[in-house]
Structures are given as C-alpha cells and as structure tokens.
Design a protein with these regions (language model features):
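Extended intrinsically disordered or low-complexity regions, especially N/C-terminal cytosolic tails and loops
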Residues: 1-191, 196, 214-258
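Inter-helical turn/loop segments and adjacent helix faces that build the functional surface
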Residues: 207-213
Length: 258
C-alpha cells in the first residue's frame, strides 16, 4: 500500500491540480486503484504530459468530467505505440531471419542439402547454440529453424561474417513505388541502424518503453523491410483485419455465454 501511495502522490505532483479533492468522486479513487494493474512508466509519462497540458491551459481542469478517463487518453497513446512497435519488430525479425536463411543456403550450403550452419566458420556460434538450447545434435534442423534459435546479437555476428553476401541486399540501388530507397552502403552504416533496432527491441520485449525516437526507429525498420522484399503496408492491413475478425468472434462468444 505504501508503494501505491508513493506513486499516487507522484502522479498528483505531476498533474499539479488546482483542486484535487474536486475529483474525489470523478475518477480520483479509480486512478489510485489502477496503479496496481497499469504500466508504471507509461502511467507516470501520461501524468507528466497531462500536467504540462493543464499548466498551458489552466481552465481545462474545470472541463474534466472524469480524471481517470481523461488521463487514460494519454496513457493509451503510449501503450498503442508500444504495441505498434512490437508488431514492427516482429515483422522485421521474421523477414530478416527468413531472408538470411535463403541467402546463406544459396551461397554456402552443399548441393541438395541445407547445411551452411555446419561450416567451421560458425562452429563457435553453433556450439553455443547447442549448449543454450540443450541440443545434442542439429540433425533434422534446417537453416530457418537454426536462425530462429539465434539471438539478434548472433544474427549481427553472422551478417558481419558474411557481409559480402548481404551487402547487395542493403546497399544496392533499389526502388519502391518509384522512390529510391536509402542504402546502408557499409557495415558500419548497417550496424548503426541494426543496433538502434536491437536496443529498442530488447526494451519492448522486456515491457519497457523505448527511449529511441519512434519516428527514427520506424523509418529504419521500414527501409530495411522494403529492402528485404517485405511489404509492411500489406502486413499491417492484413493484421488489422485479423484483429477485427478475432475481436468480432470474441464478442459473439461472449454473447452466447450470457
């Protein structure tokens, strides 16, 4: 309870309400109860944003019918960004791993056998992989499955090892809808973008807000996806359609239960 009170007082400090007691029956208690189920960083960030707005427009406080509902507009904006970035990361990782599997198989596998990952060049990475995942052998595994077991850090190492094979993918002249895509002409240039994405990915997957500017992050992911021959617009459209379908089925199911 002490922690809830501490956070609640911090939220009130950021909001800097002229008359907090006026919201006693207008969302203030609901706000306090929500602390135990909402994301701390996003809740604090939302309260800071609302506090700044109320300082800029003091009369706005009198127009708030429910403090909790009003604050949730700012909170939900942050969680929606988190979910959107999570989806971008999923698209990027999936496309990158699959494209790498195809290129490495074409360039370095034996004829009719997908065995590029058995190269001595990758022995350290493979032995570490087997140890982490408790694998005695890689019999029955193909390149797609192997790359799905590797971390993004190991993918970075593999791309560096085989940069001559991957450079055309990221550096060659390429257009999309008659627009020339920016190129990542050197390993260092690619690494800068990749490291940016990797850092944000780790933050998001550990349920933390990314400190990297969203516009910069999305821009780099979108460019890389298009260079990987992945159309993010189609993917987002299809995903949203699926979400709507799932939501509709859930509503129907709930209706049957009542």
């Amino acid at each position: 309870m002490e922690l809830e009170n501490e956070v609640f007082n911090r939220i009130l400090k950021h909001l800097a309400l002229k008359n907090p007691l006026a919201f006693k029956n207008k969302g203030l208690d609901q706000l306090k109860k929500s602390i135990s189920v909402l994301h701390y960083d996003y809740l604090i960030g939302a309260s800071k944003e609302l506090g700044i707005m109320l300082q800029k427009y003091p009369n706005k406080e009198n127009e708030i019918n429910n403090l909790f509902d009003f604050l949730m507009h700012f909170y939900n904006k942050r969680t929606k960004t988190h979910h959107m970035l999570f989806l971008w990361m999923h698209f990027f990782e999936t496309a990158l791993r699959s494209k790498m599997a195809v290129i490495l198989a074409q360039k370095h596998s034996s004829k009719d056998i997908d065995d590029w990952f058995l190269s001595k060049k990758l022995s350290h990475e493979i032995e570490r992989l087997k140890k982490i995942h408790h694998l005695e052998s890689l019999k029955g595994y193909n390149g797609f499955q192997i790359l799905n077991l590797f971390t993004l850090g190991t993918l970075k190492t593999i791309i560096k090892m085989y940069w001559s094979d991957f450079k055309p993918l990221f550096a060659d002249y390429k257009t999309y809808n008659e627009h020339v895509l920016p190129a990542y002409g050197t390993w260092e240039h690619f690494l800068k973008a990749f490291s940016l994405i990797r850092k944000a990915r780790n933050d998001l997957f550990h349920n933390n807000p990314s400190k990297i500017k969203t516009s910069s992050l999305v821009k780099n992911i979108e460019i890389l996806l298009l260079r990987l021959d992945f159309n993010p617009k189609n993917a987002f459209d299809n995903t949203l359609k699926l979400e709507r379908a799932i939501f509709f089925k859930t509503i129907q199911k709930n209706a049957w239960m009542h």
